[in-house]
Amino acid sequence: MYSKLQYISQGSTPEEQFYNINSTLDAGCKWIQLRFKNCEKKQLINLTEKIKKLCSLYNSTLIINDNVDIAKIVDIHGVHLGLKDMPVRTAREILGEDKIIGGTANTLIDVLTRINEGCNYIGIGPYRFTTTKEKLSPVLGLDGINRIMNTLTIEQRNVPVYAIGGIKHGDIDDILKTGVYGVAISGLITLSNNKKETIEILNSLLYETSTTI
């Protein structure tokens, strides 16, 4: 099963992206989502190749946001698709059955659609307002996530659901009680002055409080 903690990268340049991902891996994170919008394709391929080597050294999983073609070219573990990105079935045809395909969801209908499409995991949110992402979907909060999770059947819950969007340490316990499997975090880790301590605390909360699917 996947790590319960996914880091979504930040950085306005390839150098910043590399630094943030490298330091996050060094601090103990085992799952990276490379998210770098508005980057020239050659530059992004080059960066992805470098990050792939890093993740291999740290025995960590690497997926990329949106760019199915680059996931295929560089042969990384998979891709995360937003609601307006390439259809999951098309991505599956390109990448194959052995690759991870995650999908964003903001409503119960989104979640059920993602399950039916064959996503390997679902990122549900935003939990709260965040400046990390432009054109933010309506904020769900704890109540919104709880309502969605309570509607899912046991079989539907076999697809891991990750909460995303402005999550802090103090949110983890309540989030996991909804039945969510893990969390995807960006700003909390990126802006941390002590990434190792931040990730250790997150992993402690995630693995001591949650149940394994």
Model feature map: region roles:
Residues Q33-Q43, P126-S137:
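Glycine-rich, proline-tolerant flexible connector loops at the mouths of alpha/beta enzymes
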Residues N20, L62-H77, A91, N106-C119, ...:
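Catalytic cores of alpha/beta
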Residues I8-S12, K37, N67, K84, ...:
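Active-site beta-loop-alpha junctions enriched in small/polar residues
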Residues S3-S9, I32-L34, L62-I64, V79-L81, ...:
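Hydrophobic faces of well-ordered beta-strands that scaffold small-molecule active sites
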Residues N22-I32:
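Catalytic domains of carbohydrate-active enzymes, especially glycoside hydrolases
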Residues L83-E93, G123-L136, H169-I172, L176-L205:
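Glycine-rich phosphate-binding active-site loops on the catalytic face of alpha/beta enzymes
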Residues I45-I64, L83, V88-T107, P138-A163, ...:
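Alpha-helix-loop-beta-strand connector modules within alpha/beta enzyme cores
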Residues M1-S23, E93, S210-I213:
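N-terminal amphipathic alpha-helix/helix-capping segment at the start of soluble metabolic enzymes
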